[in-house]
Structures are given as C-alpha cells and as structure tokens.
Amino acid sequence: MRTVPVLLLVALGLAGCAGAPRRPAPPSAGRVAALPAAPVLGARAAELAAHLVGTPYRFGGESPAGFDCSGLVWYVYRELGVGLPRTAAAQHAAVRPVPADELEPGDLVFFYMPEDHVGLYVGDQEFVHAPKSGRGVERARLDAPYFILGYAGGGRVAAGAGP
C-alpha cells in the first residue's frame, strides 16, 4: 500500500515540467545521429549544467532567465553547438540508448513520472534538472528512490550533431 502514496508524490513532483506546450522542433533539431558523444563534449555539457544550478524554473523556459526540464537540456547543448529537439519525449527519441551502469557526464537521463522528464547526468549518480515551479535547477541523485521508480533510461548525445 505504500506504493500508492509514492506514486502520487512522483506524479505531483514533476507535473510542472510535464505541462510545457509541445512546440515543433526547430528545423535544425531533427534526429541526432547515433554516434557516441566525445568525452570532452559530455564533460563540457555537465560542467555548464552544473553552473546553471539555482536558475529559476520557468514553464516553457529555455534560457538562463528560467528553464523547464527539456529547455535546460536544449540550452546546454545548443550553447555547445549541438542541436537537440525541444521536448523531453523528442530528446529521448533522438539519443542513443545507454544502460544506467554506462552513463557518462553529459548523458541525458529520462523519467516517466507520469509525464516525460529529462535531466543531464553529471557523474557519481548525480544529475542536474529543472523539476518544477517553485524550485529552480538543482542536482539530484539518480539512485534516490523517487527517481529509481520513474527511471525510463539514459541516452548519449552525438558529438557530430549540430544546429
């Protein structure tokens, strides 16, 4: 019976990110080639994401003025010259799947809680994400029970992708 309250908390916890309006991806943000990311690209993405911790949450946000979950990931990779789709679901479809035990800094981590949610893995079982209104961009533990429950997989961004 404890699973019902946990599921309810999970659903409420990330509902803020889920409601972002679905916009068509920019023309340059098609499917990313399924090539492994250069370690340097991933490390730079993780470093940039870590520097954005504390930025406010903003529904539909995709700039340092405020981010939603997929806007944060989109912004980080755009700053590094890599084009990604704008929504969490489209980002999930655009990356090469990576098992949880092979995640590297810069990889994306996805959750269904109950809506699509995405964060950027920074190493040591930690990721950076924009969870919901009222909270800003923050670090979280991938191995926390809250995130284990809704984990949907990891993915690697191709180094050769670009806008």
Each predicted region: which residue ranges?
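Aromatic- and glycine-rich peptidoglycan recognition patches
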Residues: 18-40, 44, 82, 91, ...
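Glycine-rich catalytic cores of cysteine/serine-nucleophile enzymes that process amide/ester linkages
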Residues: 54-67, 104, 110-150
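Short hydrophobic/aromatic patches on the structural cores and recognition surfaces of FHA
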Residues: 72, 119, 154
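Sec-dependent signal peptide recognition
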Residues: 2-8
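Sec/Tat-exported extracytoplasmic proteins
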Residues: 49-57, 76-84, 113, 131, ...
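Catalytic cysteine-centered active-site loop
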Residues: 53-105
